[in-house]
């Protein structure tokens, strides 16, 4: 057992460190989502790996058919958890959990949602706004770019109350304003 006050590693490094296609894909994700390093991609992969493992265990439980009510309860619990997190749609099934890819996880990060909502010009600027305390969720300042935003919190993302960006005439904010539909999903 380890020391309980110390954080453990929340990601798993690749088994083959010099695999060209993987490196190119990770580099593309780092650039597209404005990540600091590939460790953030690996964290997202590990997070999804846990969900997929739970889904595979549920499928194994279903095939054994020992207790159908236990299977249904665990299935609905997993699906509803992932729907609240915003990773799955309303009519999702276990197959949708197994089909999830890393970009789905990276789209739920605060940094990405700040950029998608048009509060920043680029993913890198979105990261900077978050770390400098200019972004709030539901009125509470959040300074973690990797914070996973739930569906309920998604609509409450805005500039923090004491941030100079609250003023619409702020010089940087006028540069951020884009035409409708440009880069926003």
Swiss-Prot record:
* Gene Ontology molecular functions: rRNA binding; structural constituent of ribosome
Q: Where is the S4 RNA-binding domain?
A: 108-170
Entries under InterPro entries matching the protein: Ribosomal_uS4, Ribosomal_uS4_arc, Ribosomal_uS4_CS, Ribosomal_uS4_euk/arc, Ribosomal_uS4_N, S4_RNA-bd, S4_RNA-bd_sf
Top-level taxon in the UniProt lineage: Archaea
| Key words, A-Z | Ribonucleoprotein, Ribosomal protein, RNA-binding, rRNA-binding
Q: Which Pfam families match?
A: S4
Q: Name one GO biological process term.
A: ribosomal small subunit biogenesis
The question of whether Ribosomal protein is a record keyword is answered with: yes
User: Which CDD domains does this UniProt record tie to the protein?
Assistant: S4
GO CC annotation: small ribosomal subunit
UniProt xrefs under HAMAP family: Ribosomal_uS4_A
Functional summary from the UniProt entry: One of the primary rRNA binding proteins, it binds directly to 16S rRNA where it nucleates assembly of the body of the 30S subunit. With S5 and S12 plays an important role in translational accuracy.
**Quaternary state and interactors:** Part of the 30S ribosomal subunit. Contacts protein S5. The interaction surface between S4 and S5 is involved in control of translational fidelity.
What the record says about family reads: Belongs to the universal ribosomal protein uS4 family.
From the Swiss-Prot or TrEMBL record, give the protein name: Small ribosomal subunit protein uS4
- According to its UniProt entry, this protein's organism is Methanoregula boonei (strain DSM 21154 / JCM 14090 / 6A8)
């Amino acid at each position: 057992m380890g020391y309980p006050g110390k954080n453990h590693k929340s990601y798993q490094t690749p088994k083959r460190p010099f695999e060209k296609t993987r490196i190119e894909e990770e580099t593309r994700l780092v650039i597209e989502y404005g990540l600091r390093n590939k460790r953030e991609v690996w964290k997202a992969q590990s997070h999804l790996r846990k969900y997929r493992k739970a889904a595979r265990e549920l499928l194994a439980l279903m095939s054994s058919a020992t207790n159908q009510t236990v299977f249904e309860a665990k299935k609905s619990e997993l699906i509803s958890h992932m729907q609240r997190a915003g990773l799955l749609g309303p009519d999702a099934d276990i197959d949708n959990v197994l089909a999830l890819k890393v970009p789905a996880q990276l789209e739920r990060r605060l940094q990405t949602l700040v950029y998608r909502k048009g509060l920043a010009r680029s993913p890198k600027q979105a990261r900077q706004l978050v770390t400098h305390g200019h972004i709030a969720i539901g009125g509470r300042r959040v300074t973690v770019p990797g914070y996973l935003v739930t569906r309920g919190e998604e609509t409450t993302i805005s500039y923090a109350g004491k941030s100079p960006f609250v003023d619409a005439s702020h010089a940087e904010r006028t540069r951020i304003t884009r035409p409708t539909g440009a880069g926003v999903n």
